[in-house]
């Protein structure tokens, strides 16, 4: 049995499989007699924050740290090294935020209260999207994975800006100032060629606390820290960035992401009817994610390539881009977070309807995106 387990964890797709299993277990528990226990656990407080809060703002900051490390490495010496390939995911991300929001607005023009949820389908759940992609293992070109990483990070940063400007009423200026100072200090350490990881982790922790207290999504601190870690060590030293990336990967893939999925996928379907699913609010969210996302990402990507503004990453074609654009319709936790900000304290019924739309759109995006990606990729890695 131990050999079976060891062989499983060696699989490229193992992390994605664990994430899907964890999400499925959460859904089953949330719709069983164990639901109250599940809810009580997630809302139990440890050190002033709920378990759910620790997972989403604490553990996921480590995940975003790894993402920051991977994207920085690709920008400096990998698939995003040229200007044309680096700008490509940024252009795609803009389309991926605009089109879903417009689809949602088109469905809810007649309801001013529902319109406040316009940003719900603009988000991409990077963890779930990567988890589904990971199911295909080493068939996925590194350059395509990096495109998804970069696109989703820019998308998430855009959502953070949206939250700050449209959904946050109590930003802490002092905490933001401290956060900016810590960010400056991190890049000063980099500029001075400091390669000892512990100094970056110390400043990064203070940055995380300040961002957490500021009212902005704390996972942003992880991305900033990842970009500050130096790629090259001093003479004779190993790469700090690559060392940290290698060390974090198994913890993120086999612990943090499955825990995240378990904590966020438990959506109750109690009281759900066909009539409630076909009202404009959940339809706007679901179609914004499932149709708006690929429409925006693919059309902006296509125009960017055809106009010569950007170019496709090595080993990637437009079929791959379309499959990834569908996969980006997995809004899930980021969309749920925005829904809670838009409706949670004002209209709980709207919040529930939005979550149903998120579940529908994200599920369709995951299934269809996986199928399209599987069809478009070679059967075996080259």
Swiss-Prot record:
It catalyses: Na(+)(in) + 2 H(+)(out) = Na(+)(out) + 2 H(+)(in). One of its GO terms (molecular function) is sodium:proton antiporter activity. The chain crosses the membrane at residues 14-34, 49-69, 87-107, 117-137, 146-166, 171-191, 205-225, 252-272, 285-305, 321-341, 356-376. Keywords: Antiport, Cell inner membrane, Cell membrane, Ion transport, Membrane, Sodium, Sodium transport, Transmembrane, Transmembrane helix, Transport. Its main location: membrane. It comes from the Bacteria. It holds the Pfam family Na_H_antiport_1. It is a multi-pass membrane protein. GO terms for biological process: regulation of pH. One of its GO terms (cellular component) is plasma membrane. HAMAP family: NhaA (MF_01844). Na(+)/H(+) antiporter that extrudes sodium in exchange for external protons. This is Na(+)/H(+) antiporter NhaA. The lineage of its organism: Bacteria, Pseudomonadati, Pseudomonadota, Gammaproteobacteria, Vibrionales.
